[in-house]
């Protein structure tokens, strides 16, 4: 049986209500926040030009990432970037689709989007995700190598599409 997979990339202002609801449901199933909290967070934090990469398998949303276009102050050792960057905000693959290559497919799609925008991208991640991001072209930043200004975090940093050797 062949599995039909589709990657759909849309800006927030292109998402249908059904697509938004599917995103809320997927996020609520992954994190311990109710759908109502997901909706409120989405409305408060997501802007119309943010990018949503959805992995659809047999008409079901099984993977999702958000790339948020933000002007961000990111301090990398000596360099402070005060430019628009893509914050890689969310990465979810449903449990039953993990370790089957679908996550890699989704991240590679994201990497292409990031390269095509010619912007740098930054993410915060848990320890258990570092090797996954590294094998997909992201560079690990130790906590003393970066400072995300005006943001509370307690995670590892990863950076993509940053060619200068300032880190």
Task: Annotate the PLM regions.
Residues 51-53, 84-86, 154-158:
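Short beta-strand micro-motifs in enzyme catalytic cores
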Residues 54, 60-78, 85-92:
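Conserved beta-strand in the GNAT
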Residues 1-43, 47, 51-54, 61, ...:
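Short amphipathic alpha-helix that is part of the acyltransferase structural core
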Residues 112-126:
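Conserved GNAT acetyl-CoA-binding A-motif
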Residues 1-5, 9-13, 124-167:
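Terminal substrate-recognition subdomain of acyl/acetyltransferases
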Residues 93, 99-112:
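Conserved acetyl-CoA-binding loop-helix of GNAT-fold acetyltransferases
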Residues 70-72, 96, 128:
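Short coil/turn motifs at secondary-structure junctions
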């Amino acid at each position: 049986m062949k599995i039909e997979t589709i990657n759909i990339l849309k800006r927030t202002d292109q998402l249908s209500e059904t697509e938004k609801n599917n995103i809320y449901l997927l996020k609520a199933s992954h994190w311990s926040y109710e759908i109502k909290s997901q909706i409120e967070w989405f409305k408060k934090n997501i802007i119309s030009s943010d990018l949503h990469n959805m992995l659809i398998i047999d008409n079901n949303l099984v993977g999702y990432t958000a790339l948020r276009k933000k002007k961000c102050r990111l301090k990398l050792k000596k360099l402070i970037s005060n430019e628009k960057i893509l914050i890689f905000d969310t990465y979810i693959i449903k449990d039953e689709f993990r370790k089957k290559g679908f996550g890699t497919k989704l991240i590679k799609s994201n990497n292409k989007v990031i390269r095509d925008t010619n912007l740098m991208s930054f993410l915060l991640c848990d320890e258990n995700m570092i090797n996954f991001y590294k094998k997909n072209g992201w560079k690990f930043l130790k906590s003393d190598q970066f400072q995300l200004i005006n943001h509370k975090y307690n995670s590892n940093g990863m950076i993509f599409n940053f060619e200068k050797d300032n880190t």
